[in-house]
Curated annotation (Swiss-Prot):
Keywords: ATP-binding, Cell cycle, Cell division, Cell shape, Cell wall biogenesis/degradation, Cytoplasm, Ligase, Nucleotide-binding, Peptidoglycan synthesis. ATP binds at G109, T110, H111, G112, K113, T114, T115. The gene is murC. It comes from Caldicellulosiruptor saccharolyticus (strain ATCC 43494 / DSM 8903 / Tp8T 6331). Belongs to the MurCDEF family. Its EC number is 6.3.2.8. InterPro entries: Mur-like_cat_sf (IPR036565), Mur_ligase_C (IPR004101), Mur_ligase_C_dom_sf (IPR036615), Mur_ligase_cen (IPR013221), Mur_ligase_N (IPR000713), MurCDEF_pg_biosynth (IPR050061), UDP-N-AcMur_Ala_ligase_MurC (IPR005758). It comes from the Bacteria. Signal peptide: none annotated. Pathway: Cell wall biogenesis; peptidoglycan biosynthesis. This is UDP-N-acetylmuramate--L-alanine ligase. It catalyses: UDP-N-acetyl-alpha-D-muramate + L-alanine + ATP = UDP-N-acetyl-alpha-D-muramoyl-L-alanine + ADP + phosphate + H(+). One of its GO terms (biological process) is cell wall organization.
Length: 455
């Protein structure tokens, strides 16, 4: 039995690690900057959580785990290093945990990791393979942001930021897509592709890689690999491809066909959006290659009802439907808005909170283009996350560019005022959606609290 201290324990991934360690019989505690539903839940599970960071929290007998978002001058991290304690970055520690599992399925990609990881986890669970699953969101069908199973299968998200996934040693890899992101760390798209190439090369010869044939960047990485690469596509013949794709109000169904043109099964999705055709094809490809019965896969995908903050319907007031989505990249925003436009009876009103100054600066034109799909955009202040604003950019710059592009938009800096504005302007049949990876979803809570009418 060891004692662990997690700096940033309230994070979605760190809280899952904390609970896994607790389940394995270790003593676990940690700290976070603010109280949250997660920190309260951890205390209920018997994990001590400090609010705020203080060097006195470190006693000298702990193994310390921290996230990439923790600054180097964090007092707990500084003291742990000064005392010579074992200190691990989150991804590094996860890589060590993986050694305990026979089959590690690591899902990578700029977009869609959480949904695809959750879907694969649920398929394996339905197939009675008793997987351990670690995801970046709450998933109803997994009972949380993780589930503990046997040491046969571990399903985990693999993030490229600061090359985190290069700490992993998966036996099965998934590459959903490769896009410009995290440009505070990566120099350009070529350096991002190089990181994914290194990730793919970690897959052993007796494993396999599932890759998106329709993504040019993915194909340029996968086509040079000597490992077993299994391609999926919605556009052309592949190992697994979607044929006869149809949709009704934003919900898709399709036939899965293999490279020999054999019809395997018909998939019907219970989560909206064309992007989920890709996510479900990737999940199908992994599960079918593992030997899981196609009907079990089909049933699991149909039953899968999504992850928190992924086009999540949060309520309805007087005919106005409220959604929240984690999209924080132009490609994701475009996919989300195209889906919401199909779901909406009237207007789509977006409350957008940019996530990090560096992303806003580097992808500004992409944000303008993608947000232009909305009927109305309310821009609020940047969620800084790990950053200080050394980029000379703000949400007001985005607001001005949207106005110049002819987008109906407002800049409102306080969530309370946003809630009041929405309640005064939204009409029956409209969809109101918070979009962003920060805390913009609090606006929905305020709208629901302030609304005199519930429906």
């Amino acid at each position: 039995m060891n004692k662990f201290f997690l700096i940033g324990i309230g994070g979605i991934s760190m809280s899952a690690i904390a609970l896994i360690l607790k389940n394995h019989g270790h003593i676990v505690e940690g700290s976070d900057m603010q109280e949250s539903i997660t920190t309260r839940m951890l205390r209920e599970k018997g994990i001590n959580v400090y609010i705020g960071h203080d060097e006195n929290h470190i006693k000298g007998d702990e193994i310390v785990i921290f996230t990439a978002a923790i600054p180097k001058d964090n007092p707990e991290l500084v003291k742990a290093k000064r005392l010579g304690l074992k200190v691990y970055e989150r991804a590094e520690f996860l890589g060590m945990l993986m050694k305990d599992y026979k089959n590690v399925i690591a899902v990578s990609g700029t977009h869609g990791k959480t949904t695809t990881t959750s879907m694969i986890g649920y398929i394996l669970k339905k197939a009675l393979l008793n997987p351990t699953v670690l995801v970046g969101a709450f998933v109803k069908q997994l009972g949380g942001n993780f589930c503990i199973g046997s040491s046969e299968y571990l399903v985990v998200e693999a993030c490229e930021y600061v090359d985190s996934f290069l700490n992993f040693n998966p036996s099965i890899g998934v590459i959903l897509n490769i896009d410009n992101d995290h440009l505070d760390y990566f120099k350009d798209i070529e350096s991002i592709k190089d990181s994914f190439r290194k990730f793919a090369l970690k897959i052993p010869q007796n494993g396999f890689i599932v890759a998106n044939l329709d993504d040019e960047n993915v194909y340029s990485v996968a086509s040079y690999l000597k490992q077993n690469v299994i391609y999926f596509s919605t556009k052309t013949k592949a190992d697994f491809w979607a044929d006869n794709i149809t949709s009704c109000n934003g919900y898709y169904e399709f036939d899965v066909v293999n490279k020999d043109f054999k019809h395997l099964c018909h998939i019907k999705l219970n989560i909206p959006g064309f992007h989920n055709v890709y996510n479900s094809l990737a999940a199908f490809s992994v599960a079918y290659t593992l030997g899981i019965d196609k009907n079990t896969i089909k049933e699991a995908i149909f039953e899968f009802c999504g992850a928190s903050r992924r086009l999540e319907k949060l309520g309805k007031i007087d005919g106005i439907v409220l959604y929240d989505d984690y999209a924080h990249h132009p490609t994701e925003i475009e996919a989300t808005l195209r889906t919401l436009k199909k779901l909406a009876k009237e207007k789509v009103i977006v409350i957008f909170q940019p996530h990090t100054f560096s992303r806003l600066k580097s992808l500004m034109e992409g944000f303008v283009k993608s947000l232009s799909l909305a009927d109305k955009v309310i821009v609020t202040d940047v969620y800084a996350a790990r950053e200080k604003n050394v980029y000379g950019v703000s949400s007001k710059d985005l607001y001005e560019k949207l106005k110049k592009a002819g987008v109906d938009c407002e800049y409102i800096d306080q969530f309370e005022k946003i809630a009041e504005y929405v309640l005064n302007t939204a009409q029956k049949g409209d969809i109101v959606a918070t979009i962003g990876a920060g805390d913009v979803n609090k606006c929905i809570e305020l709208i629901l609290d302030k609304s005199p009418v519930k429906s």
